[in-house]
């Protein structure tokens, strides 16, 4: 065995004998250079096991870090889902129609019946009525006391309708008596000629019996159906139906009044209310308005037309009369087809309104089969509570329209059940209201509950920030600030109390004013009545009415109560202003107490100012809700990362900078010595081997075994560079430790160093890259927590975090959509598979593999 020794094999100037031995003794003698003897196979297995352990430890650290990150992400997503669910529930609840609303309404003390029928006024869109939409109606178990002279809604309805028609229509005396006789209308089948014959026993024509009535004062004779007239004492005297029942007797009106499309309501104002007895013991309905009434709807035998297709065709007939004088008014005949019509009184003869843009006609129709009606234009009619002589344009209505309504409109029985009551004072009354007649809830952006919650949350945040500043800066001033705050609260409460007292006085003044106005109206009515009775001759300035003057008629409220109310209102105004000024001064003093130029104080004041400016406009835009929620969400989810980054900056900046300078210094000197070591190694190798390449490569391979690394390792930076970075000692001593004493430590350090650094491990070392980097890498590291403020700053990080959150939310949505599509595809596949199996089963049953049917054989 020949031993060849040479020096200078290890860089750094230490001469280490390296021997070239045979394969047999290589294992025993290499122990002086290695902690234990191993070959290539054992080296690979040990490296693999060590790498597996390192990977396992790295995975554990990554899982812990990922778990910490996921915990905050899950908390943020939970808060997001919770807020979204809460907002959705509030939105749904605000738009949900409430079936019953239980509460208290202060409507007064004892409810007594009132005879002031003129307190009931017309409210609606019709000209002459008040435009008002705030109707309410409550159910209560309060018992009502009614006087004998209590006004009903029907009486006020008579008065209002009479006023409307008398002020809008032309007066007429057509309700006088007519001399009528019964006639028959006979027609031939071959022509449209109809003969009028005087008979005793009449027969129906066109579904009606006919009368020929003569109005001698105007030399007018009309041919009218018997259903429009009323006989008096079984004589030849007849009057139009409804003349003895209605107040207004007018001739012609504007067409729009006759349409039946003007809804009105008869309503009252406090202290008056309308009460309807429900027919149950101690159960009533109280409100400010009665039922809806439509002007122009016929009172008797109405017909409710429904459906789109309705058509009426005029039937032109020639009426032949032997002899007559003056005007002879003939009827207009129609044949109508109603696809869907209902008779309100279950009678075969009904009244229907047919109109165009510029004309209207009231038809009296008789049903001859299921959908066909024989109709005739009426001459007289009862519209609302006014008896009218209807306009009869002698032409066909081409584009017919039919008014649609229900049978309960203008029901006299219902109007008689509503009574007028009067009350005074303030007394709570338990009530319940249905949504369609009482309190109507409207949808808002996030609902009123969400707005209130947002205001409370914003105020709480501002107050918390302000109080946090006080606690952090000047603890000794907290008591003083609290005293000022308590003064502000007390002043605000006192101001609210004064405002409530002022409102009560104002309400009493309004009630008294309304009562005086109603008294003036009643006096005007009495005066008009006296003028009609006693002052017939208009030339007399003074006249006798026949009734003694009552001093109570001119008695108004001449007490000093009104002056007392005015003085109290002035005093309360002054007290309210004084209280509010005091509250403002206390609030200003509390702010001055901690008014310092400190940045935290300025932040608290600015936050309070911004939120105070936001509160009046919270309901104006939904964007503020979204921005506020995103800011809160980012604050909750990003606080740990921000604090961790600040801790790394403050604690690791010094050590990181020191390691960075050492690294640069040793890297520069190591490059010089590395060049010198390579030159020495080449000279020594040339002198010893004498050009023997095989021995050189064997020693190279043996050296690789001794180092425990592959060729890829030789291309990486030397391990002694990382040794110096790991232990912080001198170059010579650390190089000796890394190459001879602890060869594995340098390898592990190299694997876990900058070359294999994992950004997800959450290391506290702050790496400062001299070559810089792009914004994307910077912000990604900022989001992961490894590099935050020194690189890209908080605003850019905040914007990028918002983009990441939106992207993740969109990703969740797309993944959910993919799951839904996958489930649908599976369902379709299942359905197709079931259909396939059924078809296959039926096919196999119809076409079995073995046929048991024997066919006849012919020989």
UniProtKB/Swiss-Prot annotation:
Renumbered residue ranges of the record's region Immunosuppression: 498-513
UniProt topological domain (Cytoplasmic) ranges: 636-859
Region Disordered: start-end pairs: 745-764
Superkingdom in the source lineage: Viruses
Glycosylation positions in this chain: 40, 112, 141, 148, 186, 214, 233, 244, 340, 368, 399, 406, 411, 422, 483, 490, 550, 557
Membrane topology, Extracellular segments: 7-614
Keywords: Cleavage on pair of basic residues, Coiled coil, Disulfide bond, Glycoprotein, Host cell membrane, Host membrane, Host-virus interaction, Membrane, Transmembrane, Transmembrane helix, Viral attachment to host cell, Viral envelope protein, Virion, Virus entry into host cell
InterPro entries: GP41-like, Gp90_EIAV
Annotated site residues (Cleavage) in this chain: 444-445, 684-685
Described purpose of this protein according to its UniProt entry: The surface protein (SU) attaches the virus to the host cell by binding to its receptor. This interaction triggers the refolding of the transmembrane protein (TM) and is thought to activate its fusogenic potential by unmasking its fusion peptide. Fusion occurs at the host cell plasma membrane.
Assembly with partners or alone: The mature envelope protein (Env) consists of a trimer of SU-TM heterodimers attached by noncovalent interactions or by a labile interchain disulfide bond.
Name of this chain's protein: Envelope glycoprotein
Native source species: Equine infectious anemia virus (isolate P3.2-3)
Protein encoded by which gene: env
